Amino acid sequence: MANPKPQAKKKIKKNIPKGIAHIHSTFNNTIVTVSDEKGNVLSWSSAGAIGFKGSKKSTPYAAQLISEAAAKGAMDNGVKTVSVEVKGPGPGRDAAIRALQMAGLEITSIKDTTPIPHNGVRPRKRPRG
């Protein structure tokens, strides 16, 4: 007797009007995560998840497609306005913000949360010449 296949749970669509878009932009990749105000993730996207590989992941064009994909997933959950938090020095920062706006999300604020060291770790030894 064959075992019945377990039924996959249907995704419950939430209706959350406000969200936070976290853009993590490094020199190698860009990751966009849209969460509700409590921090629960509604949708996310990255260059690798879309299909970019290697050095193409670090381009502004990749960041644009990433933001559009994350915004589409957020809008499926009812998000209409987002507050943007940008972290990191990468090339996809501005392109990701513009793409969120073009996708139909209203941006209420933009905040830069890039970590800056208060004198951090000791630098490497100076080259002797």
UniProtKB/Swiss-Prot annotation:
UniProt superkingdom: Bacteria
A GO biological-process term: translation
A single GO cellular-component term on record: ribonucleoprotein complex
Sections of the chain in a coiled coil: none
MF terms (GO), sorted A to Z: rRNA binding; structural constituent of ribosome
Keywords noted in UniProt: Ribonucleoprotein, Ribosomal protein, RNA-binding, rRNA-binding
Family stated for the protein in its record: Belongs to the universal ribosomal protein uS11 family.
Function: Located on the platform of the 30S subunit, it bridges several disparate RNA helices of the 16S rRNA. Forms part of the Shine-Dalgarno cleft in the 70S ribosome.
Cross-referenced HAMAP family: Ribosomal_uS11
UniProt subunit comment: Part of the 30S ribosomal subunit. Interacts with proteins S7 and S18. Binds to IF-3.
Designated name of the protein: Small ribosomal subunit protein uS11
